[in-house]
Amino acid sequence: MLIQNASWIRMKDAVSTVVPVFKRTFGTSQPVKTATLEVTCDGVYEAVLNGKRVGEFILAPGWTEYSKRLQVQCYDITALLAGGDTHNEKKAKNTLEITVGNGWFRRTNAPWTKTNNPDEFLPAMLIAALHIIYEDGSEEVIPTDARWQVAESTITLSGIFITSRFCPWQNCDSEHPCSAATAEVFKEKIRC
């Protein structure tokens, strides 16, 4: 699994209810043979590549015994990727956005939280790796790291056992992110 070489990333000062969107723009300079995305998080996620949803899994990565394991999904994203054109000097641009909402792990009053404040959640964290194999046999891995951007989404509260709140007037989207910043690499060891 290539995800083992990626870093957990999060929004700086992220103890809040706002749902973050992690974003990575990258190019492909030649035709792509296959591409896969390995991803998991400490909440629930939805991945979108070039404006199209990745996979059909709702509430991914699903529930698990968090003190022992996290589930990792692997998606074939070849058809969603903008491949390079060998007759054109420009790289094909791709944008991957992963929204991480609160799930079973990131919920209020969970035994592993350090607060009883219902407005505070553990920071949303993400780990992922894109694996691209080009037609010439060369490979590229794009892991989660400090090159990713993170912004607040228009979702101000989400949860499995609570309602969701949206603030559409914030007008945040991939073209106009709210408080975009570089993702912070989480340095502490995660026990899986």
Located regions from the model:
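Accessory beta-strand-rich segments of carbohydrate-active enzymes
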Residues: M11-T17, V21-P168
